[in-house]
Amino acid sequence: MTASKQPKHLSKAMAKWAEQRGDLYAAACPSRGVLDHVTSRWGVLVLVALLERTHRFSELRRRVAGVSEKMLAQTLHALEEDGFVHREVYPVIPPRVDYSLTPLGREVAGHIEILTDWIEESLPRIISARAEHASRKPTPSGEEAKRELRVRSK
């Protein structure tokens, strides 16, 4: 993005990042905030639900079982702010608001859908691995291991 095309509301620090690839490993990189929004429990589910079709708020709330109104509103706001979700308000009574994905949102949701599909398909193997892990004798923590070594060496 060239300086002339940058939105005027960007700070100088953000403008710097608007012109280069993000670096998730850099503490100050705004990509970390985007990562938080996209990979949060509710962010993942909202993005994949909106990949299916446009939803109203109440439809999304039913589709994403377990999300509170407050968390859904915060999640939608963050995803809208990041440019992934489009919020369309219709001037009717009662008010109607539709949520859909932007082209950028469809792109990220497509990647996330691959992960969510893999999780659903792999769930039996994951549950089996958890059961196997739980059945093993726990390994001692750092301090416990040191005490165990001292006892053995005496």
Q: What annotation goes with each model-predicted range?
A:
Residues 1-27, 81, 86, 103-154:
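C-terminal regulatory/oligomerization modules of transcriptional regulators
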Residues 21-71, 98:
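N-terminal helix-turn-helix DNA-binding core of bacterial DNA-binding proteins
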Residues 52, 93, 107:
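Glycine-/small-residue-rich active-site loops that bind phosphorylated ligands and cofactors
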Residues 61, 89, 112:
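Short, flexible helix/strand-to-coil boundary loops that buttress conserved ligand/catalytic motifs
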Residues 68, 75, 102:
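Ser/Thr-centric signal marking residues that sit
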Residues 72, 76-82:
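Basic amphipathic alpha-helical segments that dock to polyanions
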Residues 80-100:
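Beta-hairpin "wing" of winged helix-turn-helix
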